[in-house]
Structures are given as structure tokens and as C-alpha cells.
């Protein structure tokens, strides 16, 4: 499995979410709404999720293996850093469509 494309939108918010990404896997499958979060130990990638009726968040899609999770995180964070250096990222207000 290879991440063959990463699209990134930075968000202007006071919270910890810094960007929203979409990835393409093997030129065949797209996953939207992957979030770049500024955590206590640095940036990390959170997979798309939805809130359950009891208030918990459940992943909608997620990698099965830690190796696949690492590939996704590496690709998304590399694009986040690259785009930030080039300042070629679309910024939007959090919650904007």
C-alpha cells in the first residue's frame, strides 16, 4: 500500500486541529477528513471519526496495522511541513464548508 496523493487544507482555529487532509491510496481509494492535530508530544494524524450517541468518537476508517498507520502519518505530516514551508496551503476558518 502506498499513499499516492495528499491534499491538505490548514484551518485557522485556536484549538489543536491544524489541518484537514485527504489521501489517495494506490491511485484507487480516497480517505477524506483526516485531521492533523497538535498534541502534547507534537503533531499527529487522527483518522476520520464520528460522535456516538454516548459522546464517544469512533473511527470511520482506520489502518489495521501500525506499519500502515505510520505510512499515512508520515505522508500527511510531510505534506503539512512541505506546504507550510512553501506557504501554498488553503487556509479556512474552522467549520467552514
Curated annotation (Swiss-Prot):
Keywords: Cell cycle, Cell division, Septation, Sporulation. Pfam families: SpoVG. It comes from the Bacteria. The keyword Ubl conjugation does not apply. GO terms for biological process: division septum assembly; sporulation resulting in formation of a cellular spore. Gene3D superfamilies: Stage V sporulation protein G. InterPro entries: SpoVG, SpoVG_sf. NCBIfam families: PRK13259.1. Belongs to the SpoVG family. Essential for sporulation. Interferes with or is a negative regulator of the pathway leading to asymmetric septation. This is Putative septation protein SpoVG.
Amino acid at each position: 500500500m502506498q499513499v499516492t496523493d495528499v491534499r491538505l487544507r490548514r484551518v485557522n482555529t485556536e484549538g489543536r486541529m491544524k489541518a484537514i487532509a485527504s489521501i489517495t491510496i494506490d491511485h484507487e481509494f480516497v480517505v477524506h477528513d483526516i485531521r492533523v492535530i497538535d498534541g502534547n508530544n507534537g503533531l499527529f494524524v487522527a483518522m476520520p471519526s464520528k460522535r456516538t450517541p454516548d459522546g464517544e468518537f469512533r473511527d470511520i476508517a482506520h489502518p489495521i496495522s501500525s506499519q500502515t498507520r505510520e505510512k499515512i502519518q508520515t505522508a500527511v505530516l510531510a505534506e503539512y511541513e512541505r506546504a507550510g514551508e512553501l506557504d501554498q496551503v488553503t487556509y479556512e476558518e474552522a467549520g467552514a464548508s
